[in-house]
Amino acid sequence: MSNNPLWDYSIAAYSLEGVAPACLALQDIFGLDVNVLFYAAWLAQLEQRLSHDHLAGVEAVIADWRHDMVKPLRALRQRWHQVPDAVGIRDEIKSLELRAERQQQDTMYAHYQGSAGLPWAARPLRENLALVASFSGHEDAGRFAAI
C-alpha cells in the first residue's frame, strides 16, 4: 500500500519531541502496541471515537503478524545492542522491523477503510487511548496517561 495516512501521521507524531521515549515506555512497561496507539490517536485527530468492537477487529487482523514478525524482529534488534561492533547488522534489522511495522499499519488502515465507519466525537483522544490500554491486559495500564 503506497498511500497510508495512518503511517504518515505516525512518522510525523513519532518525530515530535518526547513522543518516542513515551511510546517506548508504554511499549516496554505496559506492553502496549505503539502502532495501535498511533491508530487511536490518528482516529482522534479525525474526530472518530474508537469502539471496543472496532479495536477488537483491528487486533484480530494484526495479532498474528505482530506476534510472528514484528515482535521477533524487535527482540532480535534489541539483542544485537549487546554486540558492540554490530551497528550495521543492527541497523539492517531495524530497517526490517520498520518495514514490518509499516505492513502492520497498512493492514490496520485497510481494516479502517473496510469498516462501516466510527462515530464522530469531539476530542476523543483520551477515550481512544484508554480503550487501547484496556486491551493490553496489564494491571496498571490505566495509569499510562502519566507517561
Spans of model-derived segments:
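N-terminal interaction modules that seed assembly of large macromolecular complexes
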Residues: P21-E59
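N-terminal intrinsically disordered, cationic/polar leader segments
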Residues: K71-P72
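Short, low-complexity, intrinsically disordered N-terminal peptides in bacterial proteins
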Residues: M1-L6, A145-I147
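A non-catalytic, amphipathic alpha-helix used as a structural packing/dimerization or gating element
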Residues: G57-D68
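Short alpha-helix boundary/capping elements
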Residues: G31-N35, L43-Q48, R66, L98-Q104, ...
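Short amphipathic alpha-helical segments and their helix-coil junctions
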Residues: L6-Q27, Q113
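A charged, amphipathic interaction segment
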Residues: Q78-I147
